Amino acid sequence: KLAKDNGEIGTLEMIIITSRDPEPPGIEYLKAAGGFFRDTTIHDFDLSRFILGDDPIVEVSAYGSQLISEECKEVGDHDTAMFIMRSQKGVLIHINNSRRAVYGYDQRVEIFGSKGMMISNNQSPSSVEKFDKEKTYSKDLIHFFFIERYAQAYKDQLDAFVNIVMNNEKPSVSFEDGRNALILANAAYDSLNNGQSMKVVY
């Protein structure tokens, strides 16, 4: 985000987010999760808003399928989804989610602008790769779940929370940030159920 705010990729034009879990959760979790869009995609809605900054998302189109999990079907939830959104300034955002990625916890972000592109890719325990005249050897599998993938981020968040409490500071994340991500999730469900793009009302 800092690179985007500093103009390193020029004028922002597209955001592409991939977020896929390694395997579906159990049925008891699904019953209490509030639906795929409010459980999983809500983090991607929040991330999109964070990257966009003062450019709010004004329109959302959502598509969902039941392709993977019998438990999802049983509770009437989706396990595969895609979203196209548009910001007030015309930036287009694509999000794709899945409850199953057999190769691990797939988390990628791309921002594309008038001067270039930046990508945050998947992380592996090791970045070592081997090349010889026969073939290119695959590197280690990506992290399997969010605990491993975001271990450092959780530590940083806890440190930031302690610092806020100890120094009586205002947190950088507000109630409105969470509320607006939920508004986007609800608008996405409206789009899915109505079969049309929905304007977002905050």
Annotate each PLM feature.
Residues 14-17, 153-160:
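Generic alpha-helical secondary structure signal
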Residues 1-26:
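A contiguous active-site-proximal alpha/beta segment in oxidoreductase catalytic domains
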Residues 24-92, 96-103, 176:
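Rossmann-like dinucleotide-binding domain that binds NAD(P)(H)
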Residues 88, 160-202:
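C-terminal helix-rich "cap/oligomerization" subdomain common to oxidoreductases
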Residues 71-74, 85-156, 174:
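NAD(P)-dinucleotide binding in Rossmann-like oxidoreductases
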Residues 15-18, 62, 200:
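Short glycine/serine/threonine-enriched helix-capping/active-site loop
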Residues 44-45, 155-159, 185:
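A general structural signal for well-ordered alpha-helical segments in protein cores
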